[in-house]
Amino acid sequence: MNIPADLLYTKDHEWIKVLDDGTTALVGITDFAQSELGDIVFVETKPVGTELSEHDVFGTVEAVKTVADLFAPVDGVIVEVNEALDAAEVVNSSPYEDGWMVKVSLKDASQFDALMSAAEYSEMVGE
């Protein structure tokens, strides 16, 4: 299972990567999550401009046998939705690169302290 060391993780199996500008971040679901969900057929996110609070539902992932909510790892505003999600299977094939869900403008970097490192997430999922 792939758990990149340069990302932070949530107990809900989302990841977040702060971009080089330090003010925006990409959010997606983990390799573990996509594996557990199975073949993903549809992803729906809230639109650009949506304000999020930590743990808010910002979308859903629909797989062949289940639907799962997507939870915001931190406070922010959605500034971009990944158009590659029109082909939802990209989340299965590339959850950390091409299959990211939303880009958010960050509000409070101190919230990162509550997120897990790759080692902590790996331990949580038993890898």
UniProtKB/Swiss-Prot annotation:
Keywords: Lipoyl. One of its GO terms (biological process) is glycine decarboxylation via glycine cleavage system. GO terms for cellular component: cytosol; glycine cleavage complex. The modification N6-lipoyllysine is found at residue 65. Pfam families: GCV_H. Binds 1 lipoyl cofactor covalently. Residues 24-105 form the Lipoyl-binding domain. Belongs to the GcvH family. The glycine cleavage system is composed of four proteins: P, T, L and H. The glycine cleavage system catalyzes the degradation of glycine. The H protein shuttles the methylamine group of glycine from the P protein to the T protein. This is Glycine cleavage system H protein.
